[in-house]
């Protein structure tokens, strides 16, 4: 018989840098999960993606065991990395902070494709371009 899921915890953690301090510790402590076990497993699974923020969905079962799924980094994080900026524009319609090429957008769309609600690569690119526009990043 399959184990019953008691709780699902969603977090965004820097790759390879999970530790028992907030926000990880309190979120998992309330669910009764072995925090150090999760941190070690997460860090081992994400060490090659250092510098990126990784969304993770942790399923906690009634016997306090857990499984987790790592997702692709959020589109704004990938766009900031591609554009080489620290943060997006405070006034995206007035102030443009950077420029990315169509090829960079295509690469990000291919990376995000599994998590996006898009039928094909072109639709995924349009989603990423919209995110870029809302951050004050120009697409050429």
UniProtKB/Swiss-Prot annotation:
Cytoplasm keyword on record: no
Entries under CDD domains matching the protein: Ribosomal_L11
GO terms for biological process, alphabetical: translation
Molecular-function GO term, any one: large ribosomal subunit rRNA binding
Alphabetically ordered keywords of this record: Methylation, Ribonucleoprotein, Ribosomal protein, RNA-binding, rRNA-binding
Post-translational events: One or more lysine residues are methylated.
InterPro entries: Ribosomal_uL11, Ribosomal_uL11_bac-typ, Ribosomal_uL11_C, Ribosomal_uL11_C_sf, Ribosomal_uL11_N, Ribosomal_uL11_N_sf
Annotated Gene Ontology cellular component terms: cytosolic large ribosomal subunit
NCBIfam families associated with the record: L11_bact
Family per similarity comment: Belongs to the universal ribosomal protein uL11 family.
SUBUNIT field: Part of the ribosomal stalk of the 50S ribosomal subunit. Interacts with L10 and the large rRNA to form the base of the stalk. L10 forms an elongated spine to which L12 dimers bind in a sequential fashion forming a multimeric L10(L12)X complex.
Function: Forms part of the ribosomal stalk which helps the ribosome interact with GTP-bound translation factors.
Protein name: Large ribosomal subunit protein uL11
Gene: rplK
């Amino acid at each position: 018989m399959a184990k019953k899921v008691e709780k699902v915890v969603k977090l965004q953690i820097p790759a390879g840098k999970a530790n028992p301090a907030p926000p990880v510790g309190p979120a998992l402590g309330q669910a009764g999960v072995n925090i150090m076990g999760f941190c070690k497993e997460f860090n081992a699974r994400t060490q090659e993606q250092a510098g990126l923020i990784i969304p993770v969905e942790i399923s906690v079962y009634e016997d306090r065991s857990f499984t987790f799924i790592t997702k692709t980094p959020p589109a704004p994080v990938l766009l900031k990395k591609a554009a080489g900026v620290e943060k997006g524009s405070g006034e995206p319609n007035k102030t443009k902070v950077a420029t990315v090429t169509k090829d960079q957008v295509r690469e990000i769309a291919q990376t995000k494709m599994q998590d996006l609600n898009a039928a094909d690569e072109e639709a995924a690119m349009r989603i990423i371009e919209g995110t870029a526009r809302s951050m004050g990043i120009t697409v050429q």
